[in-house]
Structures are given as structure tokens and as C-alpha cells.
Amino acid sequence: MTKEQILVDVQEAIAEKLGKEQSEITLDKSFKDDLGADSLEVMELVMDLEDKFEITIEDDQAENLKTVGDVVSYIETQV
């Protein structure tokens, strides 16, 4: 799976969870500051991504995933 495909899949999940347009979900966007996600939404998104990519994201690792780019890079190392 390419980084670009991971990004598209992550964008789709974020758009669905947060009600955002995929075009505004870029690698540099912060979940909380730019996309307006609260802590619960971020944790729900992590669970959705775990299911989508069939991976496990440990809680301590999830806390370090602040931007869309962080998530894409992490998933890239896991698939």
C-alpha cells in the first residue's frame, strides 16, 4: 500500500468522523487545532483506523499522533 493510498483512506475516515471535506484534510493538519477534533473523537478515529488497516495502535503511541501526517507515517510502518 502506498503512502498516497494510506492518505486517501485516512482522509476518508477523518471526513466521515469529523464531517470535514477531504480536500481540507492535508498532512500538516492538526486533529485538535486545525480539524477541531476533541479527545474522544481522536480516540474513536484511532479505533476506526485500527479496524480499517487491521493494525493495533497502542494508547501511548496514539497520544503522539497529533497531525494527519503523523498518522499516515505511523500506518505506513505498520502495513
From Swiss-Prot:
Record-level GO BP terms: lipid A biosynthetic process
Keyword Nucleotidyltransferase listed: no
Cellular location(s): Cytoplasm
GO molecular function term, any single one: acyl carrier activity
Post-translational modification comment from the UniProt entry: 4'-phosphopantetheine is transferred from CoA to a specific serine of apo-ACP by AcpS. This modification is essential for activity because fatty acids are bound in thioester linkage to the sulfhydryl of the prosthetic group.
Gene3D superfamilies: ACP-like
Residue ranges of every copy of the Carrier domain listed in the record: 1-79
Family classification: Belongs to the acyl carrier protein (ACP) family.
Task of the protein: Carrier of the growing fatty acid chain in fatty acid biosynthesis.
Protein name per its UniProtKB record: Acyl carrier protein
Lineage: Bacteria, Bacillati, Bacillota, Bacilli, Bacillales
